Structures are given as structure tokens and as C-alpha cells.
């Protein structure tokens, strides 16, 4: 028995020595790299402090594509575990945009701020299996508070609106502004062109055909129907509040509203016109429209001018004054108790990490299936998403995060339009993005909160402009 105990003790001592030796090497490696010169590349001391924190904690190991890894990465077993962490970490969050913004003294994106805030608040990063070896990676309460204070400062400086109540200025979301500056004459033209079916090949389909302003800015179909009954490959996103998207279309292939407006008229399975010349030839026959157009655009009809006018009109398609916006502005009675609970659950369960900002989304491109692989079945070109634009492998199956404003009015959901209810959409997100299930009562509370995002659209009245 004594011999067994002695062998066990020797074995444990050996393990401890190996662990301490490896941890000591890792500490030396981490400490050395944290002092490298590029951490000091920003001209702003506060930015340098954040950059130093990210480097010291080793965030770039898993959240950038090309970090220098420690020597123990090549040990069998450790390599497989680290490869898994790196793959999941880089898929979930790319730190490069944050570093670039800090180095250039520019605002960090809201979606990135929201993600960093969540892992700081809930103390999920760095994970325990990482800090077990990387002692320098542990985050102290003081460091956590400093990062959260930096996030609050970024929000206050770059994102918070002046009419947000003081107690809500550090929320991961902001209210929709009451109006945006626009050119009234261009808006009038854009309104007419948005509803003009002559932009389509057979003069039967207008922009409003798939983006109805009396139906949540969508057509309510799984995918849209184009000229001649052609079936589109993807669900039509709402036109309301699209001005707040970082880029347009699910895959972000259009940088601006104007770029987006130029897509459907020439798309063979949407409006199917062969060229702008074909469209202009029809518009030229309308003397009233032509006169009105020349007053605003003396050079006359062109694809650029037509889409410029439509984009200007689309800037008016915003929906402020939802119950949630009123709450953000200080009306505590604007939300029910259930909706307030739902909003807290929305934040607790990471929803706001992607669905933040003014429209609770529209600011980043994310993959479906962070915690569990999503079964797409046969993958289509539309499913490929952002990769169609960037050609980057990391962007495969990523879509622009849809905004949640008026989401109760825009079923069916997701880019395939294959989820008919909000209840189903919430449960799918929880399962595949968060990796959990919630009691039905909690799901109901989140759905109730989502209903509070229904805003007010004031229809454009052309005769009053």
C-alpha cells in the first residue's frame, strides 16, 4: 500500500512539475509578446491601453487568422484542442476590425462593442481551459471594469442619441431618429419612381411590389415573385429603416441605398429590364414626369439619377416612436412588465451582440450555426451569402444580420423565409446561435419585447411637399 501511495505521489509530483514548467514557458511567451512594439502604434493612450489588454490576454490567438502560436500548440492533443478553439473563436468574432479602428482612432463598430461587452459582463472570456495555462490571460475585476467603461465611452461619443434618457444611454441599442435630412424634390421623384411599374420589363412590377409600405415593407412571401412569375432565390428584406444598414442586400453586395436601387430593375428574375436605356425610353414618353425630373436633374433621365431619387425617398422610410423607443427616451410606462423582462432576456442570451444599434441589426454579417451546425440541406448560391461578395472562406454562409424593427410584421423569417413565426425564429436562434433552450414563458417574453419594436410610419403625402 505504501509503495502504491509513493508511486501515486511521484506521479502527481511529475504532473505538477510538467504543468508548472509548461505554464511558466507559456507565461514567458505571453509576457514577451505583450510588450511588442505594435501595441503602442496608436497615437491615443486610451486606445493603446485597450490594444495592450487584448494582446496581453491573448485574444488574438483565437480571434485573428494569423497570430503567432506558442510552441506547445504542436503537441499532439493540445493542437487538436487549440484548432477547435481557434476555428470557433475566429468564426464567432474577428478582432482585426477592432484593432484597426483603435490604431486609426476611429469608432469601434457597435456589434463588436456589444460582443466584447457581453463576454466581459458574463465573464466568459478568456475560457477557463485557456487561463489554466495562460495565467496572464486572467481578467481582473479592475480590468473588466476598465473595458466596460471604455465601451460606455465609445457609445457616448459615437452612437448615443441626444434624446435618449440618461439611464439608457449605455444600452446596446438606440432609438430611431424622428426624421433624416432629405431633399424634398428628390423625395417626390423617388416616391413616384418607387411605385412606377415601368421600371420592369413588362411594366407590371414596381419596387413596392416586393416592398409594400402598407405591409411592413415586405411582400409576406417566402421568396419574391418577379416578372413572368419567376421565383426569386431569397426572402425580400424590409425596406423600412434600410438606410441604417451597413450595406444592402442579405450578402451586402450594395454599399449604399442607391446601389441597391439599381439592382432589381436589371435583375432577370426580378424586374427583368435589359438596360436603363429600355427603362428610360418608357419614362421619356411621360411628359409630366419628364418635366418634373428635369427640374431636379437638368441632365435628364439616367440610371444614376433614377436610383439617386429612389434612394432619397427611401431615406424617409423610417419608423420611429415604437413603444421601445419611447422607453429608451425615458417613458418607463411605454413597455409592459413582460416586454421589459423580454428585453433583459434578449440581452442576457446574447441577442444584442448581433442585434444592436438603431435597428437592432443590419451592422454585421454572421453565420447561422455558431453553437450547432445548421442543416441547410442543399446549399444554394443565396445560402453562400457574404462570401459571394468578399470571396473570403470565412464569409461562407454568412448573411447580414436582419434588423428587428417591425419584425412582428415581416414574417416569414431568415434569408430562406422558411420560419413562419416569431416564436419559431427565437427558438431557432437560441438553439443554433446560443446553444440553449429556454422555458416557453421566457420565449413568450422575448416575443413580447419584439412586438414593442413596431414603429410608426408616416406615409408620404406627395401633394403636401
UniProtKB/Swiss-Prot annotation:
Domain (Cytochrome c): residue spans on this chain: 42-155, 185-287, 337-454
Subunit description: The recombinant enzyme lacking its transmembrane domain is a monomer in solution.
pH dependence: Optimum pH is 7.0.
Binding residues for heme c 1: 59, 62-63, 125
Effect of residue 134 to A: No change in activity using either ABTS2(-) or hydroquinone as electron donor
Needed co-factor(s): heme c
Entries under Pfam families matching the protein: CCP_MauG, Cytochrom_C, Haem_bd
UniProt membrane topology term: Single-pass membrane protein
GO biological process, one term: hydrogen peroxide metabolic process
Domain of life per record: Bacteria
Annotated effect of mutating residue 82 to A: No change in activity using either ABTS2(-) or hydroquinone as electron donor
Gene3D superfamilies registered for this protein in UniProt: Cytochrome c-like domain (1.10.760.10)
UniProt-recorded name of the protein: Cytochrome c peroxidase Ccp
Phenotype of gene-disrupted mutants: Disruption of the gene leads to increased sensitivity to exogenous peroxides.
EC number(s) on file: 1.11.1.-
Cell compartment(s), UniProt: Cell inner membrane
Keyword Transmembrane helix in record: yes
Induction (UniProt): Expression is increased under anaerobic conditions. Strong expression requires both the presence of H(2)O(2) and the absence of oxygen. Expression is dependent on two transcription factors, OxyR and Fnr. The dual regulation by the OxyR and Fnr transcription factors ensures that ccp is expressed only if molecular oxygen is absent and H(2)O(2) is present.
Regulation: Does not require reductive activation for maximum activity, as peroxidatic heme is high-spin His/OH(-) 6-coordinated. Calcium ions are needed to attain maximum peroxidase activity.
Annotated heme c 2 binding sites: 207, 210-211
Reported function: Cytochrome peroxidase that enables anaerobic respiration with H(2)O(2) as a terminal electron acceptor. It receives electrons from the quinol pool. Menaquinol is probably the electron donor in vivo. It can use menadiol (a menaquinol analog), hydroquinone, duroquinol and the artificial electron donor ABTS(2-) in vitro, but only menadiol and hydroquinone can efficiently transfer electrons to Ccp, maintaining the catalytic activity of the enzyme. It enables E.coli to grow on a nonfermentable carbon source when H(2)O(2) is supplied.
Gene Ontology molecular function, alphabetical: cytochrome-c peroxidase activity; electron transfer activity; heme binding; metal ion binding
Periplasmic side: 28-465
UniProt topological domain (Cytoplasmic) ranges: 1-6
Main location as per UniProt: membrane
Keywords attached to this entry: Cell inner membrane, Cell membrane, Electron transport, Heme, Iron, Membrane, Metal-binding, Oxidoreductase, Peroxidase, Transmembrane, Transmembrane helix, Transport
